Amino acid sequence: MAADDLRFFSDNTGTACPEILSAIAQANRGLAIAYGDDEWTGRLDATLSEFFATEVRAFAVATGTAANALSLATLSPPYGAIFAHEESHIAVDECGAPGFFSGGAQLMLLPGEHGRLSSATLTAALSAHRIDVHTLQPAALSLTQATELGTVYRPADINQLAAAAHARGLKVHVDGARFANALAFLACPPADITWRAGVDVLSFGATKNGALAAEAVVFFDHALVRDFELRRKRAGHLLSKSRYVAAQLLAYIETGVWRRNAERTNRLAQSIGRAAGAALMHPVEANEVFVRLGIERRQALRDAGFGFYDWGAESAGEARFVASWDHPEEDVRALCAALARL
């Protein structure tokens, strides 16, 4: 098989699922009012309010970086400090976007086992942070759910972290690019890992889980909404034909495809993790698998036609494998067999 047929690079390499494409086609009939005043965008608040079991305000954007950076810019002034894990997407893969859109806010990066922050680490960092006119002012905590290392925060974890943040006056943001995978793993109501646990705003991802290009910024704290609306427009992320993004998000939720795709990718990742055995680096709780193979064994996998990203220190021969919603079962079985043979 060609390398493209055995790709485990990223869930971003996957296709858009039929339910999403059908929704776009349905929205592509006739005229609709522009800039979010269409009927599809008009339904987002109600649909997501039902999903989260509380009244929310939701805004469609096309990329996860826009969702994260504009959310954090809403939470932090230019002189603000945003506390996040050192492996977080906003720290490693967004080209300084939070600082750019906020006008200067800086990330304060913290360690944490398996990609997760602990309330003890956050509390210690906040306690050590000097507060006076000469320093950045603590403004926000950003968590990633599921994390960049394929692990998941439990509801109690988020509750403790949010409580520590709120006690110091910080708002709480969650990067939920793989939020569906976290929900599928926890099998809990969406509310339990968002507003009930103290989250103020969520970047609700769909693109990695079968959408074409669709993310929603979901506000549980409605006082933040007006500022965000203006920031989104000023940043060029208020789409004139918003109906096509909103239609994806509605289909993603209303058809239940979010759950179906996430459960499948989680299951495939679990299979890969079991095959990796002792080489596994982190618990497999979402759709990402990290293994430490050594340089020679990693190259042997690549020579066998498997596509994946190198990860971590080059000398350790680490690799990341990501399951997509449309991965053929036989490709996953082939990877599992190859890992077991190493």
Where are these regions (language model features)?
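Conserved PLP-enzyme active-site core in the AAT-like
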Residues: 2-304, 310-326, 330-331, 335-342
